[in-house]
């Protein structure tokens, strides 16, 4: 946020353009500078910022006034400044695998738990990228999804859409059968000699030192390269002569294996959390974001959750803000409640609440590890959400939720119960858990 405040006074230095990096810098013990900077790669100009000074008790209201005066986004979901809104205080029910036929059941459980919003899991989308409606869950496509959301609204519930904000799934038409040229590339090479469509060794002119050495799983960069209109998956690198990619699967991800001439570009496709990224500096960003915003507008979504917005293509402070700003610009309702998995200096103005993380396994120990994050959110004047706590297995108990909810009360943080309609019917402690959530929500 780039601010300092104590019990009496407050000051912030806030950039007013996406290319302005606001950050605090420790000069010496007990002394810090609030800085605003621009950099050539993102544009030295415009280089505008504002200085906000106020009594501590009036700081938030003064920032809200500054946003309007400076032309910054200043969402007011429900008619209130986002971070001060009642919507930022209310807990929400996160439902995955929602089908149109499940809506009445979800309404009953949402009311029982005292939730004000139902966040619909990202499987409403058949494939991230094109974001067509998942007809396995909503048989009539968008019309079915609209009916489901309308029923939630009619029941007095707000509707949220969860999705992976920067994602293009590996099976999406932007990837297969012909990979789009506007996917993020993080390393490049060139063929050292021509290859046919069957070669399992891809020779390179130089050592592929910048390519991922291994797949890396969920957190890895992956081992996919694009050569022309073909995607190739390799299993190892050869960093000594002959340089190249070993153990290659040709025509990966449904692309067509083909011959390529010497000198052809070999481009490493950057993978993040198991999916590819669209280039935020290309018009593919407008296409993918437009696909989501059209659905959000059509169902009159009250909330969007930008998941996966921390592992992007470059400097987080810039690309996180660019990503979330493009979504905000694409929405008809500029007062949509926005939440995400991360924020930066510029996107701080957009985000109305921050979640801690996904609670699973030893949820008590996990939450204890995450509690310092909630303090950090408070220091950035960001309302806290302890995050998503799963109810998918019988090992998740009401006792565990009682512990989590005590922390919600102490830290004045919302919670999201993360489950699906099948678990509503079979989990032995589902009713007790939802009753506890409702009780603590009233207390808080």
Task: Mark where each language-model region is.
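Aromatic-lined carbohydrate-binding/catalytic grooves of carbohydrate-active enzymes
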Residues: 86-189, 270-315, 321
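Carbohydrate-recognition beta-sandwich/jelly-roll modules
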Residues: 1-118, 151, 155-159, 302-303, ...
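Active-site-proximal substrate-binding groove within the catalytic cores of carbohydrate-active enzymes
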Residues: 319-444
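Generic beta-strand/beta-sheet core signal
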Residues: 120-121, 160-162, 228, 235-237, ...
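Flexible loop/turn segments at secondary-structure boundaries
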Residues: 125-131, 166-171, 232-234, 311-315, ...
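Autoprocessing Asn-cyclization modules and mimics
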Residues: 165, 169-257
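Glycine-rich, aromatic-flanked loop segments that form ligand/cofactor-binding clefts
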Residues: 58-77, 111-119, 144-187, 335-368, ...
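Mobile, glycine- and charge-enriched loop segments
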Residues: 67-99, 158, 219-226, 242, ...
